[in-house]
Amino acid sequence: MIVAFGDQYSKWRVDTGKVPAACGLTGIISRDGNRMAGDLIIESMRNIHDRGNGLGGGFAGYGIYPEHADDYAVHIMFEDVRGKAECERLLEESLEIVFAEEIPTQPSAAIVDAPLLWRYFARPRSERVSAAGLADDDFMVRLVMTINTTVPGTFVFSSGKNMGVFKAVGFAEDVGEFFRLPEYQAYTWIGHGRFPTNTPGWWGGAHPFNILDWAVVHNGEISSYGINKRYLEMFGYECTLLTDTEVMAYLFDLLIRKHGLPIEVACKVLAAPFWKDIDVDEDAAEQELFTSLRMVYGSALVNGPFAVIVGFSRGMLGLNDRIKLRPLVAATKDDLLYVSSEEAAIRQICPRPDRVWAPDAGQPVIGQLKGDV
């Protein structure tokens, strides 16, 4: 059964009608694995405040839980204690909970009507994993989908290891202060300021969207959402959060973790070259590869204008649609890679980058931790 996500989340959402605009994104990674305080990403997002309208903001940080590096850090929002009790029963049946607590926040006049926000550091119970015949990651994905589709008023919004997603209805900088991000240290940060155009502003619909260690922030509109959603359902993913970006997080998990595609190849699935360009490609091997990808993964092609920044355990990437209908800028400084909607957001925290460029349409910008980190 899939619970209809509507009335039970009414107090977490704000509908203002459709207003064309563009979200704001920023991502930072230290390829040497140096951890940075959360106020850095907050300041970058503050610079592009006007790209959002206060109906959603959020962040993901990697490396923030070194004391629980081998545990899944499960962040959950609950509408009420009844949903919390039902969810915790499912968690205790499936997981060994090492530690649980309310996610630390601080009072803010800018963030209102917050749900109950809890985090659980846990490991799958070996007997349950064996009985299910699944790997730990697959077991966790199935558990997340079960909770999100069957427990009323409950949503798992982060489920990776040594990382966490923090999001709410509000401007990004206010969300960051609400969740006390300056107290966290991460080697990768991604941030998002939302301006919803087709879907409601509510807590679960804020970005980033996450599954396991994949976290996605997105500016644009995924017109292929229906096809992508039906394709993902064949592999056990359920889209319940009223926002098209959700499919992007699940597609990265499916293509790279489940199907084992290299990151660069997965990007060529999502932002595939046009047939007219494949037909005239003079590199026969490349032509064969792109033809095969489009035939095998046609339903994973993401159509529409988009710019995304994706965080994962050992890296970060930025990717545009194949026509570049949304802005995306990249820069480097020493071991740092920056990706953002605007150069100004990068220069706010890195006034003199070594290099600044606009990535080509459909060409990923990838920063990964060095091998010994």
Placement of each model-derived feature along the sequence:
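Conserved short alpha-helical segments that host acidic/polar catalytic motifs at enzyme active sites
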Residues: M1-V373
